[in-house]
């Protein structure tokens, strides 16, 4: 449904980027959307590949795909769908589909979920946090949900 809808659009935005900075652990993400602001949101959120990385790492595709067709409602005839919104992530197929929601944060939450699934398998503890490093090398961690001021705290630190 989402792919058919996206294929019917005259203009699509495709954003390739990495989730994570470490070259050994980062995940290649490809976002396909019809909304410019969704593309800009993910362009700012993901680590931008260099032209060389884009040509090499993404030429064969990405590790995970996000198909954002938020303009169209979900089909309530599909088992498990109970409303007009459906945000589905299949970790085996490595695909996320967004239907019926214009909220750009759905994509971010999907990437968080992917990383929260993958990183413990590599021995890493994923955290939704930010930090400040003091003059003596001491570190303060700030934990919180989206929009609770973690970035604001480090900006004034």
Language model region names:
Residues 133-157:
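Glycine-rich phosphate-binding P-loop
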Residues 1-139:
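A noncatalytic interaction/capping subdomain that flanks phosphate/NTP-handling catalytic cores
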């Amino acid at each position: 449904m989402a792919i058919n809808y996206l294929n019917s659009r005259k203009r699509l935005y495709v954003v390739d980027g990495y989730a994570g900075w470490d070259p050994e652990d980062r995940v290649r993400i490809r976002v396909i959307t019809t909304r410019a602001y969704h593309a800009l949101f993910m362009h700012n959120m993901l680590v931008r590949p260099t032209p060389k990385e884009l040509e090499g790492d993404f030429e064969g595709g990405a590790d995970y795909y996000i198909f954002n067709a938020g303009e169209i409602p979900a089909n309530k005839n599909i088992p498990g769908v109970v409303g007009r919104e459906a945000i589905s992530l299949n970790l085996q197929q490595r695909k996320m589909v967004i239907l019926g929601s214009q909220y750009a944060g759905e994509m971010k939450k999907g990437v968080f979920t992917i990383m929260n699934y993958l990183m413990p398998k590599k021995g890493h503890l994923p955290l939704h946090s930010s930090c400040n490093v003091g003059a003596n090398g001491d570190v303060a961690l700030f934990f919180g949900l989206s929009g609770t001021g973690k970035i604001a705290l480090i900006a004034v630190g």
